[in-house]
Amino acid sequence: MIYIDNIVAQEVMDSRGNPTVKATVTLSDGNSASAIVPSGASTGKREALELRDGDSRYLGKGVLQACENVNTKLSEELIGLSPFDQSEIDAIIQELDGTENFANIGANAALGVSMAVARSAAKSLNIPLYRYLGGANALTLPVPMLNIINGGSHADNTVDFQEYMIMPLGFENFSESLRASAEVYHHLKKILKDSKHITSIGDEGGFAPNLKTNEEPIQIIIQAIEKAGYRPGEEIALALDVASSEFVNEQGLYHLEGEGRTLSSEELVGYYESLIAKYPIVSIEDGLSEDDWKGWKYLTERLGGKVQLVGDDLFVTNAKILQEGISQGIANAILIKPNQIGTVSQTMQTVRLAQRNHYRCVMSHRSGESEDSFIADFAVALNTGEIKTGSTARSERIAKYNRLLAIESELCRSEYLGRSLF
């Protein structure tokens, strides 16, 4: 019987220069695999706990304690077990922690080990990770949601909305959709440069210009799509991640600092309606605060039949919270971030719940990333159909796209949903 022979973690760096956990699992057959855990900038209140040291190192952001938890507590419990029973491994990790949000060992410790176990098992069987996790039905290449203009907490500018994205829908396969997206990105850079805007980039590779309103990025992106020779709304559509929990005040009002105005939930929904009427927007993420469930109900009633309404901070990849949303008719899609919940198995449980209830799933990176491409395989394994992993810049974002290109070339038969998504 093949068993887990060793587990070790070390502190490495993420794309923002902050420490994170790298876990390595070695099996008795000599196979070994590692995983690096991502970290978010705008985080939901109910996310699993990311354990930080809080001392003088790295401005308190060190993860030596999380690594120590891997090297002692998790290692002692998991060595000798089969790597091929992912659900059992993950259940043991949860039981060892003893809390619902990994407050003891840290979700960064838990997820690092969980991902590394899955990788080592796939490597031992000599099959790709997407095939190991998804089986024979893992055939769908995701439509990318490329963040090409950054605002909010992802950039140092005057734009309130966090992400302005393009979705290449009118293409037959993933590689063609990525090519078109890269062309739009380059045209966008030229437009910004010609207009004397700065072309510095944010955490996820998108540009971060100082623009006057939250509508102006949409207008500039449409120009870039047209300059690249594509039809807005037909071949390339738009998507927004508003991240509104970042600018809601204690009174439950939404303060758009860049525009100098404050809106109620209903007024903000009305603003979205006006944008959807004017521009080819097909998806809005975190349109209202994670605590504004009444507002979300109103948002879903008004716009749920027109666009994809994605819950990120709202659901935090948590099956229990998602079930509440399903029961109340809130949103129609969920963002999937494994580090919000803590293990591979819990992530899969949430995706399956969403899919059973006809909620779309969007696999997602975090703003603090690394060269680890686990989510690319995970998106294909779970047939999520959509993925968010930044722009066509910054190597930690490109790593995921390059992995998806490799997967597409490996598959004799694959599917790219494109326009059929909407």
UniProtKB/Swiss-Prot annotation:
Pathway: Carbohydrate degradation; glycolysis; pyruvate from D-glyceraldehyde 3-phosphate: step 4/5. It is found in: Cytoplasm; Secreted; Cell surface. It is an enzyme of class 4 (lyase). PROSITE patterns: ENOLASE. Keywords: Cytoplasm, Glycolysis, Lyase, Magnesium, Metal-binding, Secreted. The keyword Secreted applies. One of its GO terms (cellular component) is cell surface. InterPro entries: Enolase, Enolase-like_C_sf, Enolase-like_N, Enolase_C, Enolase_CS, Enolase_N. GO terms for molecular function: magnesium ion binding; phosphopyruvate hydratase activity. It catalyses: (2R)-2-phosphoglycerate = phosphoenolpyruvate + H2O. GO terms for biological process: glycolytic process. Mg(2+) binds at D241, E285, D312. (2R)-2-phosphoglycerate binds at Q162, K337, R366, S367, K388. HAMAP family: Enolase. NCBIfam families: eno (TIGR01060). This is Enolase. It comes from Wolinella succinogenes (strain ATCC 29543 / DSM 1740 / CCUG 13145 / JCM 31913 / LMG 7466 / NCTC 11488 / FDC 602W). The lineage of its organism: Bacteria, Pseudomonadati, Campylobacterota, Epsilonproteobacteria, Campylobacterales.
